[in-house]
Swiss-Prot record:
Transmembrane region(s): 35-55, 86-106, 114-134, 147-167, 187-207, 229-249, 300-320, 344-364, 367-387, 409-429
Membrane topology classification: Multi-pass membrane protein
GO molecular function per UniProt: protein-N(PI)-phosphohistidine-sugar phosphotransferase activity
Record's protein name: PTS system N,N'-diacetylchitobiose-specific EIIC component
Compartments where found: Cell inner membrane
Induction and repression of expression: By GlcNAc2, GlcNAc3 and beta-N,N'-diacetylchitobiose (Me-TCB).
Protein function: The phosphoenolpyruvate-dependent sugar phosphotransferase system (sugar PTS), a major carbohydrate active transport system, catalyzes the phosphorylation of incoming sugar substrates concomitantly with their translocation across the cell membrane. The enzyme II ChbABC PTS system is involved in the transport of the chitin disaccharide N,N'-diacetylchitobiose (GlcNAc2). Also able to use N,N',N''-triacetyl chitotriose (GlcNAc3).
Native source species: Escherichia coli (strain K12)
InterPro entries: PTS_EIIC, PTS_EIIC_3, PTS_IIC_cello, PTS_Sugar-EIIC/EIIB
Stretches of the chain found on the membrane's Cytoplasmic side: 1-34, 107-113, 168-186, 250-299, 365-366, 430-452
GO annotation, cellular component aspect: plasma membrane; transmembrane transporter complex
GO biological process terms, semicolon-separated: N,N'-diacetylchitobiose import; phosphoenolpyruvate-dependent sugar phosphotransferase system
Gene field: chbC
PANTHER family noted in UniProt: PTHR33989, PTS SYSTEM N,N'-DIACETYLCHITOBIOSE-SPECIFIC EIIC COMPONENT
Amino acid sequence: MSNVIASLEKVLLPFAVKIGKQPHVNAIKNGFIRLMPLTLAGAMFVLINNVFLSFGEGSFFYSLGIRLDASTIETLNGLKGIGGNVYNGTLGIMSLMAPFFIGMALAEERKVDALAAGLLSVAAFMTVTPYSVGEAYAVGANWLGGANIISGIIIGLVVAEMFTFIVRRNWVIKLPDSVPASVSRSFSALIPGFIILSVMGIIAWALNTWGTNFHQIIMDTISTPLASLGSVVGWAYVIFVPLLWFFGIHGALALTALDNGIMTPWALENIATYQQYGSVEAALAAGKTFHIWAKPMLDSFIFLGGSGATLGLILAIFIASRRADYRQVAKLALPSGIFQINEPILFGLPIIMNPVMFIPFVLVQPILAAITLAAYYMGIIPPVTNIAPWTMPTGLGAFFNTNGSVAALLVALFNLGIATLIYLPFVVVANKAQNAIDKEESEEDIANALKF
């Protein structure tokens, strides 16, 4: 292990330090860190709604044999409205808040008015957002949530750079020193704001004339090419979900066509075949086949703690990290990670645009998929013949999705151990990389930040 860590340090450490000081990458990282209160609050209520208030058929507690009467279930379902409202105000507006914090963080890197840049980023985001839902004059929630976060990232970075460009050229209104600072500050952002929002308004108008909008173009550019990879759908999903997440794109939502359109129907076909013949052996004897890439297989053996098998990362942090911030994030992310919700670790560490975590985050899922396929074709685990809740903890999900296979439970736990081992050396490297980045800012760094 020490040789592996030494090799990774030699290759990754200089690169990680250099990337860690890159203003745009740093702005994205710091922006997501500031979003963490929203992320954590939203994730907790997703957990409460999908696990602790769910007792109907197909729920976690139902799978454990716990049954409640219909009136109690209806009452609990009604209480989910509380968590739903919190979700709408947290994870449901991630794409709206991302440009504010990212634009603000980049403005701080550039040594210009951060608050003005952040506010203009939000205004620019809403300027290019269509105000129509059917016949109604309204903003669609789909533009504000996690599925559209790449738009928020792009707009936050672009607006902050435009703001910097304008301010550095003194295209601002300057008031006498006798005017209060708060008033002077507001007027200094007037001309930059007018120019930036005019540009965004023209872009929105032009795209609307062509029957589309900025957000839709971003989504189509991501989703359409990947959804066409039907022949290799399983591997495409396993590889591209974490890859998209690394760049701030909600991978699972971007590839919904593969999930809902192909892999979930495969799971339903497996269940129907199992129900018809009563057992996997009887179905195989009758010449029937089962789909290995059914969606619950991914949830059970690959997405351990969420995309990128981040429950393994949390465990690796507890084992190897000495960084107080990493350990605190891991503590906060563990409860939701156990139930397959990993936004706290994705945005809190963050993993997004983190150069040290790129390799393990993207590679861990294909490795776990290969192990799972090997176990399946060797006859160690049976195919998926049930659909347990996606929030089922690691091991239990595999057990229920295979209708009680202990071998499946053990393979899932083995995969979790492998994921932890994959992340371990990178957690150690991250410790040293951050120590180098956290050194006192030099005069040269300040001078570089002021360049455009």
